[in-house]
From Swiss-Prot:
This is Glucose-1-phosphate adenylyltransferase. SUPFAM superfamilies: Nucleotide-diphospho-sugar transferases (SSF53448), Trimeric LpxA-like enzymes (SSF51161). It comes from Streptococcus sanguinis (strain SK36). Pfam families: Hexapep_GlmU, NTP_transferase. GO terms for molecular function: ATP binding; glucose-1-phosphate adenylyltransferase activity. The gene is glgC. Pathway: Glycan biosynthesis; glycogen biosynthesis. Disulfide bonds: none annotated. NCBIfam families: glgC, PRK05293.1. Involved in the biosynthesis of ADP-glucose, a building block required for the elongation reactions to produce glycogen. Catalyzes the reaction between ATP and alpha-D-glucose 1-phosphate (G1P) to produce pyrophosphate and ADP-Glc.
Amino acid sequence: MKNEMLALILAGGQGTRLGKLTQSIAKPAVQFGGRYRIIDFALSNCANSGIHNVGVITQYQPLALNSHIGNGSSWGLDGINSGVSILQPYSASEGNRWFEGTSHAIYQNIDYIDSINPEYVLILSGDHIYKMDYDDMLQSHKDNNASLTVAVLDVPLKEASRFGIMNTDANNRIVEFEEKPENPKSTKASMGIYIFDWQRLRNMLVAAEKSNVDMSDFGKNVIPNYLESGESVYAYDFAGYWKDVGTVESLWEANMEYISPENALDSRNRRWKIYSRNLISPPNFISENSHVEDSLVVDGCFVDGTVKHSILSTGAQVKKGAVIEDSVIMSGAVIGKDAKIKRAIIGEGAIISDGVEIDGTEEVYVVGYNEKVGVPKDED
């Protein structure tokens, strides 16, 4: 049976610019907003868009991500005619190797894609924060009779050189693609979201492999090849909230923006929910000595200090006299008595000892996964 569209989420990135936060886990597995992981947004978009089959392509430190996704039940993707498949690099008889680029990861999973037999493939990044109706993008792809549709976001001209830029005609057909141009002609930036007619993409990738032609990356190789070959390539304009959280600063900013009840992600919209795998936790405890304002406090937290404009993730502890401002405290982290935390991201399971002061005023301060700060070595 032919399926209309298969989603493939590229989730193998190391995320080196996130420093300590990705030393032990892949970037898409990093926590966000108190109860989510970054990949939840792409998975939830798929579920809300009516996409029933999703392949998650992993590579770097995949264990936490694999455990989080499980069988896809948290996103309603565990039905008879639906499912989530974790796709990791493997060695085949031809000596296949680690994924060498975004489109090379697709090539290495041709057998899986063929088993789903889709008419279209939707390529997604697993490390962006946004809500998007992929079904609307697919309808645009069909209406234009396109071979490839690229989701684009209008960015300020001064930032355009950071992105792949699409130059389009009056009908939004892409006539030129420039990868991070010094002098951009347009402000339509690629979001790294693509819809391809599967057979056309498949034929191109197979032919390139046989001819030893480099087609390992969508931005550097595939899109330019499509344009040079005269394929119909169109832009799909996206006007909603979208955040690339590839740096510590941008991840911190996105979390701070999320605190607002009227945040641009519209997190309380019941018609487009963001789903996640959430383990059952005990109720919060907020002591009579505590003071909490303008903050998100998730299940299982213990608060006996002061929390201002911050996020406390599942099971975080803030002990007596501690003060937390403009910070993200991830799951299971413990902030000791009289500690002072300002403008920081404290990783999962981290321990901040009593009286420690952390000030990220000049640059967002990061404490890594299970890191201990101020704990004597004999107690480490």
